[in-house]
Amino acid sequence: MTAETLTPDDRVLPLSQALLLPRIAIESTMPVIDGGEFAVKAVVGQRISVTSKVFADGHDTLAVVIRWRALQDESWHRVVMADVGNNGWEGAFTVTAQGPHEYCIEAWIDTFASFCYELRKKHEAGVPVSLELQEGRSLVLQAAERSDNPLRERLMLLHHELSGLLETEQVALFLHDDSAHLMTQADHHAYLSISTVYPIDVERERAQFASWYELFPRSITDDPARHGTFNDVHARLPMIHDMGFDVLYFPPIHPIGRKIGRAHV
């Protein structure tokens, strides 16, 4: 059955299947070649800029990171991506070793950031926020309960401090960067989605660009009665290097035999 012949009923998934679908979509990730079929090329020391379209249903705040590693490494590096508008996210990482690498995009609902966004909007509009403050204290307590020390102790201290403040002071503390940092460490990554893992082939720097110098070894001689040798070429290497060349290129070198030489038919 083609898309053109689908009826509206065919496009509606059963509730049991719909509930299993991810809330977060990760699309149009770059750099990617043929959906990850082939590896992106890079060189050691290159900064790789990554862009992606990430969105979800509703108005919750998203957290998006790049996960990357050298293929032989067990652990992943993480780089926070920035929201650039219109569901666009961007970030970058630098590869420092030669060999195969891989990366993917990881996204989740940032529960505390979503709470802070709503709290700020309502507080600035003069809307009563007593219920929101109660919800926020509950979020901090839940974060403490799922964390280990010393993070647990710091979150419990934050919860205790919030409980003794006036409403305006609680708002200020909830919106403080230190509170966001603590809650980020304890985030349970709600509705986590992970993209396809994409390969990167990291080459040595000269694989991207190099200056090539070509010469004929037999012509490198200071004696008209003697053809040049590789030893004569060795003596020329400092001069070639000083001219700014990186690679020495030889044309095809054919051995000359006494009986079946290249010039004999």
How should these model regions be labeled?
Residues 82-133, 139-190:
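Extended acidic/polar, glycine-enriched regions
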Residues 2-57, 116-147:
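Non-catalytic, glycine-rich low-complexity segments
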Residues 186-208:
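N-terminal carbohydrate-binding accessory modules
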Residues 39-44, 48, 219-234:
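Short, polar loop/linker segments at the starts of domains and inter-domain junctions
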Residues 206-230, 240-264:
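Aromatic-lined carbohydrate-binding/catalytic grooves of carbohydrate-active enzymes
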Residues 57-96, 118:
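Aromatic-rich carbohydrate-binding modules that target alpha-glucans
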Residues 63-65, 92, 100-102, 246-251:
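Beta-sheet entry/capping signal
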